[in-house]
């Protein structure tokens, strides 16, 4: 199955109308270009192997390339052997699951959608995450060499960052639990740090 220039709209009667980011109650996917294999629909379950998928959402979020084995069902999204590339991020996902009891809970993605992910050799920009978690809009933080396992919703997440780099000199390896994200100022954090190196210039930039 191939598509080129397809538009898709998913609209509910009650819009969330966020000032920034994706409105899951009024989502418009534009110029979808895809190569799909083994595409099946079984009731509420959609399964396919994605060879290539590119699209943009009306919020401004753009996926330049997405590939992997995808399953969607009743508020759950599961990706295996996934790869996602945007202008600022390059994400390798051996596994990713987004689990909501139904699609309506995605309106409150930060608190209501459970995430389980394994990430390897990844570059990740907070500018991309901000489309789904608008409080991160002004962070402008890029993480590189990300190797991690995480679980939980954004607001109550735990995991193991085996490695992550940011700035010119900062490197971190840590097991963590974080509550209250993305509001860092009001959040609560527990960390078992295996390695931390940084510089005064990086600290000033992150402060």
Briefly describe each language-model feature range.
Residues 1-207:
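N-terminal targeting/secretion presequences
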């Amino acid at each position: 199955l191939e598509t080129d220039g397809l538009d898709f709209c998913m609209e509910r009667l009650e819009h969330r109308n966020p000032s920034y980011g994706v409105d899951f109650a009024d989502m418009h996917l534009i110029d979808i270009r895809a190569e799909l294999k083994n595409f099946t629909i079984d009731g509420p379950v959609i399964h396919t192997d994605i060879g290539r998928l590119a699209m943009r959402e009306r919020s401004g979020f753009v996926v330049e390339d997405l590939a992997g084995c995808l399953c969607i069902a009743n508020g759950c999204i599961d990706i295996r052997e996934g790869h996602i590339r945007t202008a600022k991020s390059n994400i390798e996902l051996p596994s990713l699951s987004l689990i909501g009891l139904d699609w309506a809970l995605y309106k409150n993605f930060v608190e209501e959608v459970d995430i389980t992910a394994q990430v390897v050799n990844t570059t990740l920009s907070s500018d991309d995450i901000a489309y789904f978690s608008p409080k991160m809009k002004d962070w402008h933080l890029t993480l590189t060499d990300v190797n991690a396992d995480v679980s939980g919703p954004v607001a109550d997440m735990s995991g193991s960052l085996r490695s992550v780099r940011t700035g010119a000199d900062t490197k971190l390896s840590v097991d963590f639990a974080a509550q209250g994200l993305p509001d860092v100022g009001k959040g609560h954090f527990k960390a078992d740090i295996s390695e931390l190196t940084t510089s005064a210039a990086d600290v000033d930039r992150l402060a």
